[in-house]
Amino acid sequence: MSTYGFKAFDKNMKNRYGIEFEEGKTYQTNSNVSFGYNSGDEVTGYHFCKNLEDTLRYVDGINDDIKIAEVIGSGNIVIYNDEYYGYYDMYSAEIIDIIHILTREEIINKVLYSKNEYAAERFIKGFKLTIEELEKFKTEYISSYRLQYFLNTQEKNKVLELK
């Protein structure tokens, strides 16, 4: 079984546990696959999400430069759903292939073309966008009052940066 998804990293292609990854490489663990992380050097699976916006749960896309990759998980795969916070289809896989590091434009377009207001709102809350990029989300499927909040926040931040 293989599953397509997304994985987020810091600007140096490290996950939140400090493990470094490279585009085009495959990683495999020999441990029992589970969702979560054991202390020490044991990797209990490589985490990734079906939905791009859900990867922002694991990195600070507002304050830090991040990278998001398209990945394929295979081998033994464990599925995790966090119903309390509304995160679904998160995976931990025995094997993960880092297929492609998305450009900023590709990241934004994947969310825009999903035509999913909930996904777009979650993305906007977790990914630092410029005012021009936020304007792209002004469409019939994004509630204007929600988007206006983020536009106002970005404009205030821009004014503060100029001072």
Where are the language model's segments positioned?
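Short, glycine-biased loop/turn motifs at secondary-structure junctions and
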Residues: 1-163
